[in-house]
Amino acid sequence: RLRKNGETFELTKKLALSTTDASIQEEQILVLTAEEYQFFAQLEGKKIHKTRYRYEYLPGEFAEIDVFQSALSWLVLVDFEFQDLAQKDNFSKPERCWWDITQDATIAWGILAGKSYQDILPLIQKYDYTPLFLT
């Protein structure tokens, strides 16, 4: 994943550490210069455009709220990351978060790249998802 956050540029890769639990991953981050970021950004390929917001839902505990743009502009997903398995196992999702899609390979980030609402509608109907339009 190629990311820009203000004047910080990164190339991120997630590695699955478990074949049975998609939430157990290692993230490798390569810090880029602005020039390196621009080089990767101009490459052809499937892309996702989104704005990420950090929300402190408990003291010291943050959720990352992804508001998608372009063809997926109706989609909002929330990501929770944990320091260890005990924290993950003791987590209770906030009531405003409706479904846990962690183990759903049809909604994994790589799968969403290059897709539109119409493309993934059949995959998300099982969640009775209501599109969220922000103005």
Regions found by a protein language model. Name each.
Residues 1-135:
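Phosphate-end processing signature that detects enzymes handling 5′-triphosphorylated RNA
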